């Protein structure tokens, strides 16, 4: 895959598109001249051109005829614009172009209806894709040939670890869990950073402790294939009790419990709010996680 000239045309210039651009170009060394962006906002297109050395334009007739892969990378609030945008480029799309959607909640059936006769697939990645530490999955359309799947695998594995799924229903479940855990993990880290600062630690030290602890827990559980209680990491009751007392004092236990006990419909509603919030935050400061206002 790396040895092939592989043009990728993105429809959409928001956060979803930039996650891919940043990771593939800056972290994985993919050539910028293989990336093209079609967006509605001229200033945003100019920003992406300068930032990633790609070509970007508001002219939806440009670049499409060069595409090996067309990536639907439209942010959630703009999903309703997709049919009109596709209509502008339909007669320019190469007949063998792969249609690849990273737009949340846009079903395979909708993609196949917009691009009849084309191989189609959906990809899902979490926000850690920006550092190449994501976990993601994909599903393919009914008529999509198997020889196109390496493209999806390549894109996901460039940004993290691939999870195999059987169908779109399982794809949706995996995606929901990934984003729900993303939200709860960031909230938990935020809680611990704020508590550490209240206890008198510097913000830099607080952040280092919180992030390294979460990283270490993940690695330990993955390598041991155990849950925390089987690993017997709570054997020191005095230390454990002190930790729980600290959590109770600052209301952290209640906050984290509420997150993890959310029913599915609440998780989905929160995901939509999180995506919209991420988009708004992204407009202020690209890829800078602000834990404190």
For every predicted segment, state its role:
Residues 1-5, 208-293:
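NAD(P)-dependent Rossmann-like dehydrogenase/reductase catalytic/cofactor-binding core
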